[in-house]
Amino acid sequence: MDQDHLKNAKNATRRVGRLRSLGIVTVGGAALVAGITAYKNQDQLFRTFVMPAVRLLPAEASHQLAVLACKYRLCPVSQYHDDQNLHTSFFGRMLSNPIGIAAGFDKNAEAVDGLQDLGFGFIEVGTVTPAAQEGNPKPRVFRLTEDKAIINRYGFNSDGHQAVLQRLRLLRKKENFNGVVGVNLGRNKTTMSPIADYVQGVRVFGPVADYLVINVSSPNTKGLRDMQSKEKLRELLEQVNDTKSSLDKNKNVPILLKLSPDLSLDDMKDIVWVIKRKKSRVDGLIVSNTTVSRENIEKNKLAEETGGLSGPPLKARSTEMIAQMYQLTDGKIPIIGVGGVASGYDAYEKIEAGASYVQIYTALVYEGPALVEDIKAELSALITRLGHTNVADVVGTNSKFYLPK
């Protein structure tokens, strides 16, 4: 077969695949819309009907459907009133609660309004790359249902900087929108200048974001995690901070660093050395990304799939690492804790280990939108029951307990 015929065949196959995905999402979407139209605001419907039905779809198709549901604001609007003890400061902004949606759900800033409807205190979009890219070949998302976990190897599929920027600009123009939105920055798969990709991200999104995340910890882009090494990270963060200081607008935008849970203690010490230096400092940490480890999961053929594991099997390791980073930084660098949070109790553990804020994602896939209210209500009750006035009073109070034994 000559090259032109081969290229045409590949393009035809790709179009068929896209049409098939569109069909799956459209049919699933029709069912979802019908259910919501009839029973909107009844959380029990989501748990007993909508979520099980959505999970019958292929994992990536159900993800696309969930994004569409939030994009068109079809999910129940939260009626929960955040208790005063959940209110907390977030890099100069006030949050009504410390629970956020992690990057990876709304990769392209399409669903921010709908996510805010669910009651999140802050929203992180991305990962966003400079140029649009499709990511890794499909299938690339796998549910480990028995563990309520997910393995993904998306590979930074992204609409690119300019498309996401336009959406965020439109969002900021809305009179009734006052949400806290962070942008998670990545590099293109084929880039020859990885640092330049992050620098460009700071330049593009610095003026419109409430915070920026330097993501060098995804396991699904070759060579990315190498950028967590001491000298490479120092060089990257120095250039990021130089770019931030040169911004015409919002030059105090907080810079956060997202870390892998697979780092050794020596790796963590090297990172702390870097981020304590003035030129390569960061304003916060996100602990942690997905893991390549397959510990704490049931025997399952899907567990052999390549990619990052998220959900309950990651919970203990991410909490342990939060405690380690809290201790190594003397509690002076705010931490967003993420990994396996599925309840208010899980969130409380992350916070007493050293996290000031908590993000969720995988549990939302299994439990549905009512989970956000459930986590907040349980967390608020725990704070009161255990004798604290505010969530900020809990941060790091039991950090040493979670350190490796």
UniProtKB/Swiss-Prot annotation:
GO MF annotation terms: dihydroorotate dehydrogenase (quinone) activity; dihydroorotate dehydrogenase activity
Keyword terms of this UniProt record: Flavoprotein, FMN, Membrane, Mitochondrion, Mitochondrion inner membrane, Oxidoreductase, Pyrimidine biosynthesis, Transit peptide, Transmembrane, Transmembrane helix
Superkingdom as given in the UniProt entry: Eukaryota
PROSITE patterns for this protein: DHODEHASE_1 (PS00911), DHODEHASE_2 (PS00912)
GO cellular component: mitochondrial inner membrane; mitochondrial intermembrane space
The UniProt record lists the keyword Transport: no
Mitochondrial intermembrane topological intervals: 40-401
Xref: Pfam families: DHO_dh
Residues annotated as binding FMN: A103, G104, F105, D106, K107, T127, N184, N215, K258, S288, G311, G340, Y361, T362
Task performed by this protein: Catalyzes the conversion of dihydroorotate to orotate with quinone as electron acceptor.
Protein's name according to its UniProt entry: Dihydroorotate dehydrogenase (quinone), mitochondrial
Organism, as annotated: Drosophila melanogaster (Fruit fly)
